[in-house]
Structure formats: structure tokens, C-alpha cells
Swiss-Prot record:
It comes from Citrobacter koseri (strain ATCC BAA-895 / CDC 4225-83 / SGSC4696). This is Glucose-6-phosphate isomerase. Catalyzes the reversible isomerization of glucose-6-phosphate to fructose-6-phosphate. Belongs to the GPI family. It catalyses: alpha-D-glucose 6-phosphate = beta-D-fructose 6-phosphate. NCBIfam families: PRK00179.1. Keywords: Cytoplasm, Gluconeogenesis, Glycolysis, Isomerase.
Amino acid sequence: MKNINPTQTSAWQALQKHYDDMKDVTIADLFAKDSDRFTRFSATFDDLMLVDFSKNRITEETLAKLQDLAKETDLAGAIKSMFSGEKINRTEDRAVLHVALRNRSNTPIIVDGKDVMPEVNAVLEKMKAFSEAIISGQWKGYTGKAITDVVNIGIGGSDLGPFMVTEALRPYKNHLNMHFVSNVDGTHIAEVLKKVNPETTLFLVASKTFTTQETMTNAHSARDWFLSTANDEKHVAKHFAALSTNAKAVGEFGIDTANMFEFWDWVGGRYSLWSAIGLSIILSVGFDNFVELLSGAHAMDKHFSTTPAEKNLPVLLALIGIWYNNFFGAETEAILPYDQYMHRFAAYFQQGNMESNGKYVDRNGNAVDYQTGPIIWGEPGTNGQHAFYQLIHQGTKMVPCDFIAPAITHNPLSDHHQKLLSNFFAQTEALAFGKSREVVEQEYRDQGKDPSQLEHVVPFKVFEGNRPTNSILLREITPFSLGALIALYEHKIFTQGAILNIFTFDQWGVELGKQLANRILPELGDDKAISSHDSSTNGLINRYKAWRA
């Protein structure tokens, strides 16, 4: 990957001038001038997904200039580098190959002179055999009973992805009850343990190194709870499995290393649901549905790696995001799925985007003088409409939004889905076109009221509009289409990082807090006053000690 400051390209300078021309142009103007705007600014994927980006403050000239930026920063070369196994995560000297985990074409992918696909396929086969034994009831707990509950213990990428997917694919789930524990707050594990039976519970401990503080603290608490009933350490092997590469530590914990499922250093945590970390997904929906999830992602991988940038969906969405973040000063993006099963999707890509592109140092090691990753947030519709849409519609901040919905619901109860989708369609229309003062006044006249007598309220009912949105309409949320949707966002994030000249696949920002916590932890072991930190931290620790006494 090349190290190119995007602001030094001629395309960036052209975009800056173009912004001066576009900043006062409204979305309503753009639609008024072009009756075919939807056709020109939308695209389908596999007849399963429609991406409508017409309600954005862009023209064909905007997109052309953004494409020029992608060319000048060598996006095509960056894509090739990732897919070919080059070590593009240079700060950790690692390849970035989550795409290999879902490489259903099974074409060789070489890392350090070795094809990784045989090992990928071997772990998949091992997960298949293990999951089928659990799901079928063939696997028995220490009292001879079949497993009824699975508890995934992990944090970050070892939790967010599997939790999001198992929730999104609930219509496909089997009889096993799934639970996820991530927080080191003892409340999280305690509340889950209240719901499960040690005789019929399987724990998955998801930690590559088997040293992650939060995960191992929870794992040891789960083990202690289990042994308080089982009373024999040999029974741990029937109720615990590991998603890890540290065979020594796994064995010392009491887990049979035959039930340790590996992944590799070229699998980043926030891109790991496709790996052994996805074992909880397989246990929830079955191996065949997991393969469909992989296949959907692989289909998007092929689209991303082979489609020209002008028609490439992840690239288009990435470029539009850069346009708003760097030229309009939009600091956030909202992800708004109109599907209750997708209630963790925004949280998943909050990590996916902010941990990937939340960087202020470029690939040359210099502080950037432009915007990198946006703040990502969101909630399912229509809940969000009754919470924060007020700010999106009438606030002082521009918040570009992605609206996501399935055309076909898994729960066709009376007219629920039509009402849900009517809101989905209405919100993007309202955000784009707003409501003028004239329309507000006419509405009062239609009600037999004199607008001049209501001047005190009219301004508050005006909507400026011109708020940008993308609409992503899926035919139905299936394992395949969900896989494609996740990969769409993954590649959008990669594209933005490549163009913005940052390292997307490390996360050094999580380290300092962990180091300081490890230093502070021993200081909390007694009641002595602390004076080794700044006055604020000292004051907080000492008040904590006083109150806990």
C-alpha cells in the first residue's frame, strides 16, 4: 500500500473547489433537475440488496471527483494488497485476511509462502463435527444430559460479532439457548449463571491468547461456579471449549485441546466472526446456515475486488462518507436498521469503524490534518424516531444516515411490517425534502385556522430538509444476505482507511488504558490512601476506598 496524503492530491483540491459550488445546493434541487436521479444513483447487488444513494448532496461530478481521489491514492492497489495476503497491517507485521475465512471458491491465498486455505477448511470441518455433536444431543455433560445452553465468554470482537449475528439470525435458531458474557463487571456473568444449569451448559472461552483480562476473569468465575456443583476438575472438559491459539494455557484451564478451535494472527478481532470465534453462531443456527453467511460475504468480497470503482458499492458508500466527513464537517454517521433482529448491528459497526479508523497518525507516522474515522451510532427504527431523530431532522448538526430494512419480514403479523416500512420510506423522504413554511401555513388553512394567528408556532414546524441518507433495502434478511451486508460495511471501512492513509487493522488506542488499569489494580487491594497519580485520579481512588470500607 502506498503512503499518500490525500489532501496533497489534485483530486482533493478539486473536491474542495467543488464543495464551494455544492454547499448551498439542496437535495430537492437535485431531484427537481433530474427525473431519473434514483436510477442514476442506486444499484442492486445479486438481486438481494438495493442501495439507494440518490438522497445525498452529490452529483455525477461529485462522484467523478471522489473516484479521482480513489485513483490518486491507489485504492485499487490497496485492495489487491489485502486480497493477495500482503502484510498491510504494518505496525503488527500481519496480513489482513478475514476474506480467506469465507473464501468459498477455495482459491489459494498465500501468506509467507504458504496457502492458508487447507488450515481454514480444517478448522471449519472441526467446528462442523463439534457443533453437530452438541446440537444433536450426542455430546453429553458430566451427568449424561444433553447440552441445552451455550455461554460465549469473550469481549470486543469475540463478543460483538457473534452476538450481533445470532440475534440477527434468530429466525434460524435451533433449540439451544445462547448467552453472551463480555463485561468484567461481575453482574454480567452472575446474571447469566442464574439462568443456566451446570449439568447442561457449555461455555465457549473466546480469547486468542487466553490471557484477555475480562474474558479470563469471567471464565474462571464460570469454572468455579461449575465446579461448585460438579466437584471434579475432570468434568470441565465436557462443559468448556476454547476459541484460542494458546494450547498450553487452554490445557491448564482443564479444557481438552481437542476442543480448542484455532484462528490466526491475520484475523483481526473485529473481523473474526467468520473464524472459530463464530462457533457460537454455528451452535445457534447450524453449520449450513453459517456456510451461507460465509457465502454471502464471499459474494460481496468478489464484488468488491473485481467491480470497477464507479459501480463498486463499498467504494461508493466509502467515498460519500469521506465527502461528508471531510468537506461538510459531518462528524457522525447513524446506522438505523428497521428490523428488530438487527438491534445490535449499529453497535457492531461502532466497533468495526471506530476501532479501525479512529486514528490521528497516518501510515508515515505523522499526525493528520484532515478527518479520519467518523463517530458511529444508531438504534433500530422505529424506536429511534421517538428518541433522537428530532436532532437529525431539526438539529444544528449534519448526521448522514444509513437506513436498512428487509422487504420481507420473518414475522408477518397483520400490518406490522407495512407500518414499519412506511416509516422507513417516510423518514428518508422527510430528511431529504423537509417541510417549508408555505406548506406549514397551508396546513393551518386547510384546518380552518389563520396562520397569522399562529406565527408563534409556525417556525418550529418548519423542516429544512437537505439531510443526507442512504437506503439499503434487502429482499429478506437471510444468512446469505446478512453476510453480504456485513462485508459491504467491512469493505467500506477498509476503503476509507486506504484513501485516508491510515492503518485500519491495528488498535493501539485500547492499550494505554489497559496498562494503567494493570498498574492501578494492585493499589486497590488495601485501604491505604493513594498519592501516586494526578490529584483527580488519587481523589477518585481514595473516595472509592472510603465508600467500599
